[in-house]
Amino acid sequence: MSKKILLGITGSIAASKSENLHSLLSKNNETVVFSTDEGLKYISEEFQNKNDIFHSWDQLDGSPHIEYARWADNIVIYPATANFISKYANGLADNLLLSTLLMFDKEIYVAPAMHEEMFMDNKIQSNIIDLSDNVIFCGPRYGNLDIGDKGLGRLIEPIEMFDILFNKKEKVIVTSGPTSEYLDDVRTITNKSSGKQGRAVAIELMS
């Protein structure tokens, strides 16, 4: 079934892959592209010349964050940087894309792309958990990263993102960390679980 999709691009070196995703999406769907100013630095001039890439309020009349939030069936942030995820989780609206996200009340897909150390940082993980009630996180994968590194943080491939959009997966709940069972008002049985295994399971399920 054809969809109206708003593709959001942020300032990651992996943003060049968004051009391939746009090509896949545009074959049978209506697609509009919003980008942050940083995102523009990582997509080709050819792509920008062939497509309308909206990044500034000055490019559109009226209230585009309202109009496009109501127009789109889905918003896909591909790729999403640590900075963008953190701003979104904290309700910041300092650009057109973030303002539109905060207006949107349907399914949002976010594909993180960053170094493993950033992705596993407690603050980033907390932001992802906070957003997970309303956002479907897609990836990242383990693989090649910037400056020749390898790790968990590689953006999922365009075809994977496309398949997720059109072959929706079921939701699951993963619990982790220490548990407590009260014996009476004073005594309790607990454990020293770190929650690392549960987090690893959750990350694998998100990918």
Language model regions located:
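A cross-family phosphate/adenosyl-ligand binding-site feature
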Residues: 1-207
